[in-house]
C-alpha cells in the first residue's frame, strides 16, 4: 500500500487508546475498542506506594488481565504503573505479571497536582536520573519477554530537560516511549508542540508514539507528518469523537472515510450505559459516567447537548434507560 502523503510504500501505523484517569476506565476501553480502529489500549494508572497489590486490586483497575490482557473486542491492553519507588514498582510489576499482565508501561506524565504532590507522574521529569533508575530497575527485574514502555510529557515547568528525560527512559531499557507534546505547566492548553516529538524521536533509539491534540483526521495527519511517528496515541479526542480511530484506520487502509452521525452515536451511548450498569448498578457510577461523556461530546455533536439536558437531573437508572431508548428512536426516524 502507498502512503497518500509521500507516495512511498506505507509503514504500518499503530493507533493506541491513551490512559486517562477517571475517564477511560475498562468500560470505556471496552466500548471504544468495539467501535474499532485501535491496535492497543493502556489502562488507567495503578498507583504504587508502599504495598504490593493483591490480585483483586489488579483486576479492579485492569480487568482485561483476566481476559488474556485484551478487551472483549480482542484489543491488547497494557498495564500502567505510577510511582517513584523503583523497588516497590518492580515488586508490583512482577506481581502484575504473575497474575497475567504481559506488558508494563510507566507513567512519567500525569499532570494532576495531587499525583505530583506525592512524587508521581510529571514531577519526575525534574529528575531524569531517578527516571533512569526506575526504568533500569524494572527492566532488570522483569522477565526478558515482558515489554516495558513509558509515557512522558515535555517537562514540568519547561522543556529544558525533555531530551534528557527521553534518553533516560531509552537508556534505562524501555522498548518504547509515548510523548505527550506539552509540559505539566501547560496542562491541556493549546497548542501541543508536535515538533518536539520529532526532536525526541531523533534523539532516542526506541520507537516513539506521538500524543496530544488529535481531535480529527486532519489532526492525525498533522501530528504524524510533523512528528515523523508511525504510532499515534489518542486521548480526549477518542472520547469526544468515538469513531476517530475507525476513521483513521479507514484512511490508512486507503478506503472511503465514513463520518459517524449522532444516530450511530446514540446506539453507542445506550450500549455504554448498559455496560456501566453491568459493572456497578447500585451506585452513582453509571449516571456519573454517562453525564461525563455527554458533557465532553457536546463539543463535537450538538445533539449531545439535547440528550445531556434530558438526563442531567435524572437519578433513576430505569428512567435514564427509557430516555436513551426514546432518544435513539428519534435519531433513527
Curated annotation (Swiss-Prot):
Entry EC no(s): 1.3.1.-
Residues engaged in binding FMN: 19-21, 80, 151, 211-213, 235-236
Gene3D superfamilies: Aldolase class I (3.20.20.70), Dihydrouridine synthase, C-terminal recognition domain (1.20.225.30)
Signal sequence annotation: none
Any Pfam family matching the protein: Dus
Enzyme class: oxidoreductase
UniProt site positions, description: Interacts with tRNA: 47, 107, 188, 289, 291, 312
Cofactor requirement: FMN
Residues the record marks as active site: 110 (proton donor)
Alphabetically ordered keywords of this record: Flavoprotein, FMN, NADP, Oxidoreductase, RNA-binding, tRNA processing, tRNA-binding
Catalytic function, reaction form: 5,6-dihydrouridine(16) in tRNA + NADP(+) = uridine(16) in tRNA + NADPH + H(+); 5,6-dihydrouridine(16) in tRNA + NAD(+) = uridine(16) in tRNA + NADH + H(+)
InterPro entries documented for this protein: Aldolase_TIM, DUS-like_FMN-bd, DUS_fam, DusC, DusC_C, tRNA_hU_synthase_CS
One Gene Ontology term of the molecular function aspect: flavin adenine dinucleotide binding
Job of this protein: Catalyzes the synthesis of 5,6-dihydrouridine (D), a modified base found in the D-loop of most tRNAs, via the reduction of the C5-C6 double bond in target uridines. Specifically modifies U16 in tRNAs.
Entry's family note: Belongs to the Dus family. DusC subfamily.
Protein's name according to its UniProt entry: tRNA-dihydrouridine(16) synthase
Source lineage: Bacteria, Pseudomonadati, Pseudomonadota, Betaproteobacteria, Neisseriales
Amino acid at each position: 500500500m502507498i502512503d497518500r502523503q509521500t507516495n512511498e510504500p506505507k509503514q504500518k501505523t499503530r493507533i493506541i487508546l491513551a490512559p486517562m484517569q477517571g475517564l477511560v476506565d475498562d468500560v470505556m476501553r471496552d466500548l471504544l475498542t468495539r467501535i474499532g480502529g485501535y491496535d492497543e489500549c493502556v489502562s488507567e494508572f495503578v498507583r504504587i506506594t508502599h504495598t504490593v497489590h493483591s490480585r483483586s486490586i489488579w483486576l479492579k483497575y485492569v480487568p482485561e488481565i483476566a481476559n488474556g490482557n485484551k478487551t472483549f473486542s480482542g484489543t491488547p491492553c497494557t498495564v500502567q504503573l505510577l510511582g517513584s519507588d523503583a523497588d516497590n514498582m518492580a515488586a508490583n510489576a512482577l506481581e502484575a505479571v504473575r497474575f497475567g499482565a504481559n506488558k508494563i508501561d510507566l507513567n512519567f506524565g500525569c499532570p494532576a497536582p495531587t499525583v505530583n504532590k506525592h512524587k508521581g507522574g510529571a514531577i519526575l521529569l525534574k529528575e531524569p536520573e531517578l527516571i533512569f533508575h526506575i526504568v533500569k530497575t524494572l527492566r532488570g527485574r522483569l522477565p526478558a519477554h515482558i515489554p516495558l514502555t513509558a509515557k512522558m510529557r515535555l517537562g514540568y515547568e519547561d522543556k529544558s530537560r525533555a531530551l534528557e528525560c527521553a534518553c533516560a527512559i531509552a537508556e534505562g531499557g524501555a522498548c518504547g516511549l509515548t510523548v505527550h507534546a506539552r509540559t505539566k505547566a501547560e496542562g491541556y492548553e493549546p497548542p501541543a508542540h508536535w515538533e518536539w516529538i520529532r526532536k525526541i524521536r531523533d534523539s532516542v533509539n526506541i520507537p516513539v508514539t506521538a500524543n496530544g491534540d488529535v481531535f480529527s483526521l486532519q489532526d492525525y495527519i498533522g501530528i504524524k507528518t510533523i512528528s515523523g511517528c508511525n504510532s499515534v496515541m489518542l486521548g480526549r479526542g477518542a472520547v469526544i469523537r468515538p469513531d476517530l480511530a475507525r476513521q483513521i484506520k479507514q484512511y490508512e487502509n486507503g478506503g472511503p472515510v465514513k463520518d459517524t452521525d449522532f444516530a450511530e452515536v446514540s446506539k453507542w451511548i445506550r450500549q455504554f450505559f448498559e455496560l456501566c450498569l453491568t459493572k456497578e448498578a447500585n451506585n452513582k457510577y453509571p449516571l456519573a459516567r454517562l453525564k461525563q461523556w455527554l458533557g465532553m461530546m457536546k463539543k463535537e455533536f450538538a445533539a449531545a447537548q439535547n440528550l445531556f439536558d434530558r438526563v442531567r437531573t435524572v437519578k433513576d437508572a430505569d428512567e435514564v434507560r427509557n430516555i436513551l431508548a426514546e432518544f435513539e428512536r428519534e435519531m433513527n426516524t
